[in-house]
């Protein structure tokens, strides 16, 4: 691996997903999840790989687009804030039944204390309800490392994986060692 660079949770998620081999990211804007998609859109590695990025009509269509990519065996990332889980609930819960082929990670950015939202909500309940694995990283390094694990787990279990972060975590920074193939060291 390379020398550690200073990364936010946002950057660790984006780099982790890119290095895990995603083919596309599908999102509906909402702080702080918007920044993940923006980072991927600007990433030289993502551009070189022709990684698809789409701002969707809503979170449900983002989930459906990611599932479509998964059904042909490719990996996808879905990004939304916590209230978006309400919008994509139908597609999210049913994806536990239909399953996935390529790995799908659903990133939900919860906002305890309503820093930039109209309500508080814990997205983990959707994962518990749908019997979908839930990952909640506690550091930037864990976040980066967990992305590869999340995609492997998704493909092994043939179900999406829910990853939860919070607004305040999203903007904190710490040293992260990225894969040797990764050329982006700081963000």
PLM regions and their residue ranges:
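Thiamine diphosphate
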Residues: 1-141, 145-147, 166-173, 182
């Amino acid at each position: 691996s390379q020398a550690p660079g200073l990364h936010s949770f946002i950057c660790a998620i984006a780099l982790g997903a890119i290095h895990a081999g995603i083919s596309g990211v599908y999102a509906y804007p909402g702080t702080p999840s918007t920044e993940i998609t923006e980072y991927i859109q600007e990433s030289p590695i993502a551009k070189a790989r022709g990684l698809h990025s789409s701002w969707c009509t809503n979170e449900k269509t983002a989930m459906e687009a990611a599932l479509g990519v998964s059904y042909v065996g490719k990996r996808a990332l879905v990004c939304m804030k916590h209230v978006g889980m309400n919008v994509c609930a139908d597609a999210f819960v049913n994806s536990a039944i239909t399953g996935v082929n390529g790995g799908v990670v659903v990133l939900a950015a919860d906002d305890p204390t309503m820093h930039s939202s109209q309500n508080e909500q814990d997205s983990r309940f959707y994962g518990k309800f749908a019997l979908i694995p839930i990952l909640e990283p506690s550091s930037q390094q864990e976040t980066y490392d967990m992305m590869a694990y999340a995609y492997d787990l998704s493909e092994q279990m043939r179900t999406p994986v829910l990853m939860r972060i919070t607004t305040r975590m999203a903007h904190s920074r710490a040293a992260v060692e990225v894969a040797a193939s990764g050329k982006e060291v700081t963000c």
